[in-house]
């Protein structure tokens, strides 16, 4: 409820480290549940996204998820970085949503947009 323009939230797999001081919303019930894509799909119903940040490793290590990101965010600005830079960027997020996802690099930083 406290997400303003340009603020960020992270949706991550179950292995993504949550930076100290960043609130964690832990949805992981068991390996694979809920999935990264299920959680992302629900969040996108209620959030206007201006741009995304994903790790470049996703393209080669998790091509199915990479392809889905390209489809979901076609026309949106995409920040690509290595995984270490991604984790550094997560330190400024308003929250990290931890899923039960167990595929590699299934993580995204969503930058809040505005609806007008």
PLM features: residue spans?
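Short, glycine/charged-enriched secondary-structure capping and boundary segments
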Residues: 24-26, 67-69, 111-112
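N-terminal intrinsically disordered, cationic/polar leader segments
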Residues: 1-5, 10-11, 15-18, 22-39, ...
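Non-catalytic C-terminal interaction segments of nucleic acid-processing enzymes
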Residues: 105-110
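Mid-chain, well-packed structural core segment of small domains
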Residues: 41-85
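Short, well-ordered alpha-helical segments in soluble proteins
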Residues: 73, 112-116
